[in-house]
């Protein structure tokens, strides 16, 4: 389970939004967890516990689950030279910075990026890391170490690129690898880190970067290896019209059709963005259980378009939520992303748009489904104790708590949550990270960032 046995009792929860199959909302209840698992929810529980919280006036929710990020981008946010670029030019410019990644940059960008997620109610993070400069060190191991330091549940990926500029791709030669190198390292990382057990704190997916930066052979071999090891598959797809035109010119087919020929559909696959799917492609996603991670802030910033989330939900396509990379968001708050998604889809029709509660379920149960997990994403007996608490007496929530299921999307929460709990352990206490020194970490991160950007 990742930690030694710990008992937690949260008393007097004003309202507990479970996001369970029955959409249950409990009032004035206690929650008891033992060894990271919820053992009881009910009034006036008499249970011994090492940690007891009084949650009177508190709203309680399942921990948010981030299903697409690029934590290494934390140190390339708000750069003036890329603010008015769209995806392809944006990537080409930033690769000249990212080619200098090392373990110090990855460690501190992971600590600060995941720390921000946790302070805003996130308890599980998936990161899509695909930039591996020669001689950079054990970048994925470094990410897992940072997650352990913070106490967050972590899904890393062995991303990859094998097409550089000389091959018709976008990245420089120094950050691409051969298919053989990638496959060997992928197997090593799965065998070293992937834990498929209940309550796992560490899992690994295989995640080639995108169809325009990897070869068909890399995609094919990644799918074969992932299924041999029973791990999941992830990549960017249908993010921009440029990608669609590139694939039509190179392969003579649309991106999803190309991916389907390589085995990249099914309930073990999820795509980031999925903006430009047509009607038939949405039906294929629904029929095969292939998922989509919605990243609205990034899609707006890069003028990529608006994913057809209302249509996906109607058809039964699995949908989760993600912040995307820190350089295209430019932040790491899934709470903010939840409200952004809610508002974005009301541009066309409030009647057709998903509700505030729909988006909460997308960010919890929906995201858990994309990661292939049924032990997180809702609050019920037998599930992992991943949750966050918000004091309903906050100034910004005055007059706003009549519908606790929707309030995170309709009104939003600007500052940090009061408590975040992962695996039955408090990881954010009174709005501050409980397991690291925030100021010291930020100070060290600024120094490393300045050196990194000054190269």
Sequence positions of predicted segments:
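His/Asp/Glu-enriched, well-ordered alpha-helical/loop segment
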Residues: 261-268, 310-394, 410-413
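Alpha-helical scaffold segments that flank or form the walls of functional sites
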Residues: 77-128, 133-153, 183-198, 446-454
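C-terminal cap of metal-dependent C-N hydrolases
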Residues: 19, 384-442
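Active-site gating loops and adjacent loop-to-helix segments of metal-dependent hydrolytic enzymes
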Residues: 75-106, 135, 163-179, 200, ...
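Metal-coordinating catalytic core of metallo-dependent amide/deamination hydrolases
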Residues: 135-274, 280
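Acidic, glycine-enriched loop/beta-strand segments at the rims
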Residues: 16-28, 302-304, 309, 368-405
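N-terminal metal-binding scaffold of metallo-dependent hydrolase/deaminase domains
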Residues: 1-47, 58-59
């Amino acid at each position: 389970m990742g930690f030694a046995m710990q008992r937690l009792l949260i008393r007097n929860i004003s309202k507990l939004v479970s996001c369970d199959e029955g959409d249950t909302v409990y009032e004035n209840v206690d929650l008891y967890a033992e060894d990271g698992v919820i053992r009881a929810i009910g009034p006036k529980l008499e249970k011994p516990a090492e940690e007891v919280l009084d949650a009177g006036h508190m709203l309680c929710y399942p921990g948010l689950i981030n299903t697409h990020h690029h934590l290494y981008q934390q140190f390339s946010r708000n750069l003036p030279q890329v603010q008015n670029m769209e995806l392809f030019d944006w990537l080409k410019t930033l690769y000249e910075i990212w080619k200098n990644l090392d373990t110090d940059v990855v460690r501190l960008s992971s600590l600060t990026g995941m720390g921000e997620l946790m302070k805003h109610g996130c308890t599980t993070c998936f990161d899509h890391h695909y930039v591996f400069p020669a001689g950079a060190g054990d970048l994925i191991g470094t990410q897992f170490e940072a997650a352990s330091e913070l106490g967050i549940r972590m899904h890393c990926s062995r991303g990859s690129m094998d097409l550089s500029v000389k091959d018709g791709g976008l990245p420089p030669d120094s950050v691409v690898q051969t298919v053989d190198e990638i496959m060997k390292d992928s197997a090593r990382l799965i065998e070293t880190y992937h834990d498929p057990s209940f309550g796992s704190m560490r899992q690994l997916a295989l995640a080639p970067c995108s169809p325009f930066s990897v070869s068909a052979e890399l995609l094919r071999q990644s799918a074969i290896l992932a299924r041999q090891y029973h791990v999941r598959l992830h990549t960017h797809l249908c993010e921009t019209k440029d990608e669609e035109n590139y694939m039509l010119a190179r392969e003579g087919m649309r991106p999803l059709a190309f991916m389907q020929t390589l085995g990249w559909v099914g309930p073990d696959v999820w795509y980031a963005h999925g903006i430009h799917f047509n009607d038939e492609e949405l039906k294929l996603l629904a029929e095969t259980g292939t998922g989509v991670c919605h990243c609205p802030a990034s899609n707006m910033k890069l003028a990529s378009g608006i994913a057809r989330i209302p249509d996906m939900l109607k058809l039964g396509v699995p949908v989760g939520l993600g912040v995307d990379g820190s350089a295209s968001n430019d932040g790491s708050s899934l709470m903010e992303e939840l409200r952004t998604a809610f508002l974005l889809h009301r541009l066309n029709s409030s009647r057709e748009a998903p509700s505030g509660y729909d988006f909460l379920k997308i960010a919890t149960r929906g995201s858990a489904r994309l990661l292939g997990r049924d032990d997180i994403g809702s609050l019920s007996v037998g599930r992992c104790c991943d949750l966050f608490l918000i004091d309903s007496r906050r100034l910004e929530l005055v007059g706003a708590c009549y519908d606790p299921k929707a309030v995170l999307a309709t009104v939003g929460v600007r500052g940090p949550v009061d408590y975040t709990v992962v695996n039955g352990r408090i990881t954010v206490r009174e709005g501050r990270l409980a397991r690291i020194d925030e100021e010291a970490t930020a100070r060290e991160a600024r120094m490393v960032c300045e050196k990194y950007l000054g190269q």
